[in-house]
């Protein structure tokens, strides 16, 4: 292994089929993104969109889970993060299927003629408050550059009638996001409440919305069992990705 590769692998996360460097990204690879990338429904999709791609994690997870014919667009506003996402994708088995765009999603959407079967986002959710150490981290954490109404509007403009728009959010913020989405004409179709263990209340929620009305399926996912090892359900969801699972 070359010295440059060794340094790269100390600044990222190694999965079974790909590596994500994230040292130049404001937000690092974490459980939220891994949950969303493993959970989002991919059956029958032909084209996917990752809004706020960051390191490219979600785009890479979707590429692993979908057929070779599926194309994925990853849009990231911050130039350093977009450049690192492109590098991660270039080193993956799916470089020809993922297109990275350094752009403001609100402007990028207006130039598109295609529609997406699956749109995915791990969006900012903090309101403006304590300053972050860098403008890049503030952009990744706060809803100042893309608030939730704007995000929902962008997704609505480019989703297919039967498509899904999937997000992961803290539980309480997710409830507010759901109310907002419903008021804008979206329909909640899938909801998974995520708790660290059986004794704790859910701290994250995975949500899938669609323009098309239909039954909403809800469940609960516990990350760790009584022995503090990963639960069977969490293992089943993520074992295709985690290196030592």
Curated annotation (Swiss-Prot):
Catalysed reaction(s) here are: adenosine(37) in tRNA1(Val) + S-adenosyl-L-methionine = N(6)-methyladenosine(37) in tRNA1(Val) + S-adenosyl-L-homocysteine + H(+)
Biological process, per Gene Ontology? tRNA methylation
Cite the entry's keywords alphabetically: Cytoplasm, Methyltransferase, S-adenosyl-L-methionine, Transferase, tRNA processing
Q: According to its UniProt record, where is this protein mainly located?
A: cytoplasm
Q: What is this protein called?
A: tRNA1(Val) (adenine(37)-N6)-methyltransferase
The knockout outcome noted for this protein's gene is:
Cells lacking this gene show hypersensitivity to hyperosmotic and, to a lesser extent, oxidative stress.
Q: Can you list the GO cellular component terms from the UniProt entry? A: cytoplasm
Q: Which SUPFAM superfamilies match?
A: S-adenosyl-L-methionine-dependent methyltransferases
A GO molecular-function descriptor: tRNA (adenine-N6)-methyltransferase activity
């Amino acid at each position: 292994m070359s010295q440059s590769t060794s340094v790269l692998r100390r600044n990222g996360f190694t999965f079974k089929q790909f590596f994500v460097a994230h040292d130049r990204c404001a937000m690092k690879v974490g459980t939220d993104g891994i949950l969303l990338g493993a959970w989002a429904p991919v059956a029958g999709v032909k084209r996917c969109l990752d809004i706020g791609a960051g390191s490219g994690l979600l785009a890479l997870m979707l590429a692993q889970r979908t057929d070779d014919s599926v194309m994925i667009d990853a849009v990231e506003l911050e130039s350093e993060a977009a450049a690192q996402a492109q590098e991660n994708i270039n080193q993956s088995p799916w470089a020809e299927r993922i297109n990275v765009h350094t752009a403001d999603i609100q402007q990028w959407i207006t130039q598109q003629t295609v529609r997406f079967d699956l749109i995915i986002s791990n969006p900012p959710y903090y309101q403006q408050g304590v300053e972050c150490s860098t403008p890049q981290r503030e952009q990744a954490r706060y809803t100042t550059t893309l608030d939730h109404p704007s995000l929902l509007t962008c997704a609505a403009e480019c989703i297919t009638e039967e498509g899904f728009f999937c997000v992961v959010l803290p539980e309480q913020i997710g409830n507010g996001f759901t109310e907002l989405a419903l008021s804008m004409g979206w329909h909640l179709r899938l909801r998974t409440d995520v708790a660290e263990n059986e004794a704790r209340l859910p701290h994250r929620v995975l949500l899938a919305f669609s323009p098309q009305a239909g039954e909403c399926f809800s469940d609960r996912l516990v990350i760790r069992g009584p022995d503090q090892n990963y639960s069977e359900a969490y293992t089943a969801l993520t074992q295709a990705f985690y290196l030592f699972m």
